[in-house]
Amino acid sequence: EENRTTMTAALQQLINIGVTTPNEGIVAASLGMKERPDRTSVLQHLSAKKLFILGKEDALIPYQKMTALVESIGMQSAVLEGGHLVYIENEAATIEVLRNFMKQI
């Protein structure tokens, strides 16, 4: 709720994208996300270092559930203040986490 008042420009940009996207495209994208196969095995077998950035207030995918999955496949994770779009909601922290990760690889 707080982000709705502090991020009005970013929210308006997302709304503009949504209202200009044809309904068929929105439905297809939603179904694609819902029906996509589990690709966890791809991450499990990838030998490169991996990082998953999670939003602490994500209402769609609880970070606790994702943290357990990420740890089970040997990935690094960062839990930041923000929701499902944490990279928009907490851009500065996201950039800092990415910079630190890039220094490791």
What would you call each of these model-derived segments?
Residues 33-34, 70, 86, 98:
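Generic helix-packing signal
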Residues 36, 104-105:
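Generic structural signal for alpha-helix termini and adjacent loop/cap motifs
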Residues 1-47:
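Conserved alpha/beta-hydrolase catalytic His-Asp/Glu region
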